[in-house]
């Protein structure tokens, strides 16, 4: 079991129950899933770019990504419906906790000029979305084997009802929100 999951069960639940005066342990917000998304618009011309992006995503997440396809044709972007244009991974359970632990303790501190993540990125329902400009902040990615620096979107979905509850949950994990 991941250390962060143990920490959540042992101290975060009690801390949040006291802070928000929940009557039941089941009311305490929890992390439900983490979704990683990498849009590779250049994959229209070169299929190898999408394969490399999917390989990077598999290394970062520990599971095989789903190739996302264009929902509709857009002439301005030169894409047709059904073209593969990105990849995504949904992490749940142990892999989710391990990824969150690596993100907080290893990956985010490796970002250049890092001053914390934006507090405005909550969606109103306690979920948090952020973008990472470089996939090389993850220690699993070998810098010498990277063909191109790509960014990815990370969405942390929680069972919190409000942004305040979601912020308190992530702050309890020492998530760097100012």
From Swiss-Prot:
The keyword RNA-binding applies. InterPro entries: Ribosomal_uL5, Ribosomal_uL5_bac-type, Ribosomal_uL5_C, Ribosomal_uL5_CS, Ribosomal_uL5_dom_sf, Ribosomal_uL5_N. Keywords: Ribonucleoprotein, Ribosomal protein, RNA-binding, rRNA-binding, tRNA-binding. One of its GO terms (biological process) is translation. Disulfide bonds: none annotated. Pfam families: Ribosomal_L5, Ribosomal_L5_C. The keyword Heme does not apply. One of its GO terms (cellular component) is ribonucleoprotein complex. One of its GO terms (molecular function) is rRNA binding. Part of the 50S ribosomal subunit; part of the 5S rRNA/L5/L18/L25 subcomplex. Contacts the 5S rRNA and the P site tRNA. Forms a bridge to the 30S subunit in the 70S ribosome. This is one of the proteins that bind and probably mediate the attachment of the 5S RNA into the large ribosomal subunit, where it forms part of the central protuberance. In the 70S ribosome it contacts protein S13 of the 30S subunit (bridge B1b), connecting the 2 subunits; this bridge is implicated in subunit movement. Contacts the P site tRNA; the 5S rRNA and some of its associated proteins might help stabilize positioning of ribosome-bound tRNAs. Belongs to the universal ribosomal protein uL5 family. This is Large ribosomal subunit protein uL5. It comes from Aliivibrio fischeri (strain ATCC 700601 / ES114) (Vibrio fischeri). The gene is rplE.
